[in-house]
């Protein structure tokens, strides 16, 4: 039986084969999907162990974990728990938002290049997506974006801040003005990397019911395997979303892990500080390695950097043979790759291997 017409013509979200799971993982440095490079907080490990021994594993998960929702609201310092809902990661939140707020005739605007799953999901259900492309330096022209919204009659705009894959953070006041000035457009602000910047539009959700923020525990909190995230939005939107959202979808172990992580915020903050230091040192190394300028986008504020190289496939393959997995982004940005940032010790090892590559190639050649 054939898939429906939308799926037949869909360009899928391009993931990568996970060779890591088919090899020995003891000597691997996974820097391809922007996960944390350290284990979760010891609080998380201990809480999971306790639940495995004493919890009701034969029950469905808590469908309205008020304690966890309150903890998240407290963490935001802006709202109460009526503005929060849990999801099994940001992806499922994006999928639910598309299904709840859009009709087939609506148009989605996507600030690109960006995380591509939102586009894939929308196209998969027959909704048109239109890209608003950043300039050559990956800067965002807000006046042009507002014109684009009106000209294309955009119903929903997806904006990742900080941007993935560039790591750039956009002017938060200009984002807020855009949301306030366009009350008939739904804005999805993907704040997956919020912890690395502390910049948010969360203070707008009480006054603006055209705003949904998506966040995740997969990055700074080191809970990627648990697949848990949350949205922040006006209670009216939460009510609409919960008409479709499956309340049993977030596993109990994931809820336990998220709650424990929020009880040890210092662990997360220490890791974020370490990554910030490692990123600055790594970018400094890259800039000394290259000649001719350009190529290294040193204004990333997140836990990754985007770099370019003339022989990007060769570069990615070389690091993979050394047990370092990074993300080839050539399908979206020609001859570019994204490298997640770990600890200073980890990135020192990566720098050593990149230096070996450059020596073999007679330099680190930019495009």
From Swiss-Prot:
GO molecular function, one term: transaminase activity
Residues recorded with modification N6-(pyridoxal phosphate)lysine: 219
InterPro entries named among the record's database cross-references: Aminotrans_II_pyridoxalP_BS, Aminotransferase_I/II_large, PyrdxlP-dep_Trfase, PyrdxlP-dep_Trfase_major, PyrdxlP-dep_Trfase_small
CDD domains per UniProt: AAT_like
EC nos: 2.6.1.-
Pfam family, one: Aminotran_1_2
Signal sequence range: none
Pathway: Capsule biogenesis; capsule polysaccharide biosynthesis
Keyword list, A-Z: Aminotransferase, Capsule biogenesis/degradation, Pyridoxal phosphate, Transferase
Cofactor(s) this protein requires: pyridoxal 5'-phosphate
Biotechnology (record note): The reaction product of this enzyme, serinol phosphate, is an important precursor for serinol (2-amino-1,3-propanediol) production. Serinol, in turn, is an intermediate in the formation of certain drugs, such as the anti-cancer N-palmitoyl-2-amino-1,3-propanediol, and the orally administered fingolimod (sold under the brand name Gilenya) to treat multiple sclerosis.
Family: Belongs to the class-II pyridoxal-phosphate-dependent aminotransferase family.
Record's protein name: Dihydroxyacetone phosphate transaminase Cj1437c
Organism, scientific name: Campylobacter jejuni subsp. jejuni serotype O:2 (strain ATCC 700819 / NCTC 11168)
Taxonomic path: Bacteria, Pseudomonadati, Campylobacterota, Epsilonproteobacteria, Campylobacterales
């Amino acid at each position: 039986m054939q898939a429906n017409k939308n799926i037949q013509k869909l360009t899928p979200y391009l993931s990568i084969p996970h060779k890591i799971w088919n090899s020995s993982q003891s000597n691997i440095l996974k820097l391809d999907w922007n996960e944390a490079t350290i284990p979760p907080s010891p609080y998380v490990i201990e809480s999971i162990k306790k639940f495995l021994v004493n919890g009701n594993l034969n029950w469905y998960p808590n469908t309205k974990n008020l304690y966890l929702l309150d903890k998240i609201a407290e963490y935001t310092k802006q709202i109460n728990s009526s503005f929060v809902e849990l999801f099994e990661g940001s992806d499922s939140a994006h999928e639910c938002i598309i299904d709840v707020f859009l009709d087939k005739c609506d148009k989605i605007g996507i600030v690109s290049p960006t995380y591509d799953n939102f586009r894939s999901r929308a196209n998969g259900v027959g909704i048109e997506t239109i890209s608003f492309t950043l300039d050559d330096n990956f800067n965002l022209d807000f006046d042009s974006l507002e014109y684009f919204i009106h000209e294309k009659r955009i119903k929903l705009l997806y904006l990742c801040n900080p941007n993935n894959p560039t790591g750039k953070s956009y002017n938060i006041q200009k984002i807020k003005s855009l949301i306030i000035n366009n009350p008939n457009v739904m804005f999805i602000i993907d704040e997956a990397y919020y912890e690395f910047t502390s910049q948010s539009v969360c203070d707008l959700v009480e006054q603006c019911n055209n705003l949904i923020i998506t966040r995740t525990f997969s990055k700074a909190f080191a809970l990627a395997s648990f697949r848990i995230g949350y949205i922040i939005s006006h209670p009216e939107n939460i009510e609409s979303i919960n008409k479709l959202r499956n309340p049993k979808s977030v596993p109990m172990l994931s809820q336990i892990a998220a709650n424990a992580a929020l009880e040890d915020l210092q662990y997360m903050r220490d890791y974020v500080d370490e990554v910030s230091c490692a990123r600055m040192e790594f970018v400094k190394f890259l800039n000394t390695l290259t000649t001719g300028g350009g190529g290294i986008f040193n204004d990333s504020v997140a836990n990754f950097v985007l770099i370019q190289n003339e022989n990007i496939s060769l570069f990615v393959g070389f690091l993979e043979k050394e047990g370092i997995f990074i993300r080839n982004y050539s399908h979206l940005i020609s001859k570019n790759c994204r490298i997640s940032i770990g600890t200073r010790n980890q990135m020192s090892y990566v720098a050593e291997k990149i230096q070996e590559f450059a020596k073999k190639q007679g330099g680190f050649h930019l495009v």
